[in-house]
Amino acid sequence: MSIEERVKKIIVEQLGVKEEEVKSESSFIEDLGADSLDTVELVMALEEEFDIEIPDEEAEKITTVQSAIDYVQNNQ
């Protein structure tokens, strides 16, 4: 499974959205209905899945599906 597929799978599980709703340009809050707690839990799930640490200042920049994919790809 690619990084993109793994990230999207985590988003589907964490936010309870349908897979087809999760597009690269989707914003977690505006498009996928996440709140601030959801985004924190999403970052924690990404850290666990990919065995990385995401500092708070970086986590705040992860607001879309693509930004999550890019962050993981650049920090693995």
From Swiss-Prot:
GO annotation, biological process: lipid A biosynthetic process
Residues modified as O-(pantetheine 4'-phosphoryl)serine: S36
Record bears the keyword Cell cycle: no
Changes after translation: 4'-phosphopantetheine is transferred from CoA to a specific serine of apo-ACP by AcpS. This modification is essential for activity because fatty acids are bound in thioester linkage to the sulfhydryl of the prosthetic group.
Cell compartments where the protein resides: Cytoplasm
GO molecular function, one term: acyl binding
GO CC terms: cytosol; membrane
SUPFAM superfamilies the record matches: ACP-like
Keyword annotations: Cytoplasm, Fatty acid biosynthesis, Fatty acid metabolism, Lipid biosynthesis, Lipid metabolism, Phosphopantetheine, Phosphoprotein
Pathway terms, separated by semicolons: Lipid metabolism; fatty acid biosynthesis
InterPro entries noted in UniProt: ACP (IPR003231), ACP-like_sf (IPR036736), PP-bd_ACP (IPR009081), Ppantetheine_attach_site (IPR006162)
UniProt domain Carrier: residue ranges: 1-76
Pfam families cross-referenced by the UniProt entry: PP-binding
PANTHER family, per the entry: ACYL CARRIER PROTEIN (PTHR20863), CARRIER DOMAIN-CONTAINING PROTEIN (PTHR20863:SF76)
Function: Carrier of the growing fatty acid chain in fatty acid biosynthesis.
HAMAP family for this protein: Acyl_carrier (MF_01217)
Family affiliation: Belongs to the acyl carrier protein (ACP) family.
Protein name: Acyl carrier protein
Organism name: Actinobacillus succinogenes (strain ATCC 55618 / DSM 22257 / CCUG 43843 / 130Z)
